[in-house]
Swiss-Prot record:
Protein name: Guanylate kinase
UniProt feature coiled coil, ranges: none
Reactions the enzyme catalyzes: GMP + ATP = GDP + ADP
Single GO molecular function: guanylate kinase activity
Keyword list, A-Z: ATP-binding, Cytoplasm, Kinase, Nucleotide-binding, Transferase
Amino acid sequence: MNNYIFIISAPSGAGKSSLLKAFLATDIGKDNYAVAISHTTREPRVGEINSREYYFVTVAEFEQLLSQDGFIEYAKVFKNYYGTSKAELDRLLALGKNIILEINWQGAQQTRAIYGDRAKSIFILPPSLDELRKRLEKRNTDSKETIDYRMEQVQSEISHADEYDYLLVNDDFSQSLEQLCKYFEQNIQS
């Protein structure tokens, strides 16, 4: 089996994590794909568990792994480090899975530079900026200042959408999930 690396990026609140969770519950998702768990220095949110959503590490631990060339991609986002370790990708490739990387545009650029055509990329867009703000507020996990900062960064993030192989506007969740499933199916058969 040729394993592919699927990069998925989106502004915070566009529905990336929800779509991925739903996709991984489908027959094709659960049998053929695995999400690489990233390292981060941010604090866990309520309900998040170390080594399930992220590997939560200190800044010193992250920087040590970074100095050992242990990441395929990393970035500092909203004052915290995020990165995907080489060891995590090796672990998933050994299982024979297609790998999904839930990363930002900077990490996507780094990953495409390493893996070339083996890396497929999807950018998920919100239907509008107003809807995006509503979603962020509804999550009830960030302060108003954090939401305002995230909204300031959206234009920069969206400006990189044309670097991706596939753009998906997450307006209707069911339709977006169906489109995402089709994209994954088509790209493992090609």
